[in-house]
Amino acid sequence: MEKEAKTYLRIKNFVAPFIGLAVNISAYGTENIVPNGKLILTCNHRSDMDPFILSYTFPRFISWIAAEYTFRIPIFRDLAKIAGGIPMSIDGNISIGSIKMIQQVFKKGETLGIFPEGHDYMVKNDFKSGMVNFHSGFAAFSIRNKVDILPSVIIPVEETYSDIPIPPIVRSFMGMPKEVCEIKKRSIYKKVKVIYGEKIDHREFLSGTLEENMKQLSDVVRSRMIALQEGQYAEA
């Protein structure tokens, strides 16, 4: 992943000044970010700006899990591939090729970034509501590969809403799922807080069956992320 990491950092260094000008970003709990070693970074997902906001505040290379259909979007597809993006189907299925890429991320001691809500929050399109239910695939990655999880949240302080710039018929032609084609609005951040919580040790979730452990770990991560949204930094 060394080539991808270098490409990611070049893109980040180029984009960061523009992100910083467009959005007032404050980060809290950055002392919880471990400086090295394999890691899974989770975050809530309410805007297509989220990967850029999180990457802006996170000092390490992030290899992002992204919905498979996003790799059909011109420009994004090429950027995602050269910057270490890993495609995953929205139904939770993942190809052998993607599994090998994830294993390489961990073998190199890098960070895997994932949004456990998938695109469900944006499909719901109610930006005043709380987090939706999680998909538990990230918990399987953690348990099977013995990787700790760092929970984080993005809290909007100021945001506006605009129509999705790509018309539904074009989205459909690009092969996007029906529910994505029907999304009406997108959130555009003006001011946000990014909060990082304490690392969650995967070893506490190895004693039961994989299915039981996945649910328990997923529930713990979600509750920690909700606590971050409501905790000491929420009103900072």
Q: Where do the model's predicted regions map?
A:
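Catalytic core of membrane glycerolipid acyltransferases/transacylases, capturing the structured
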Residues: 35-93
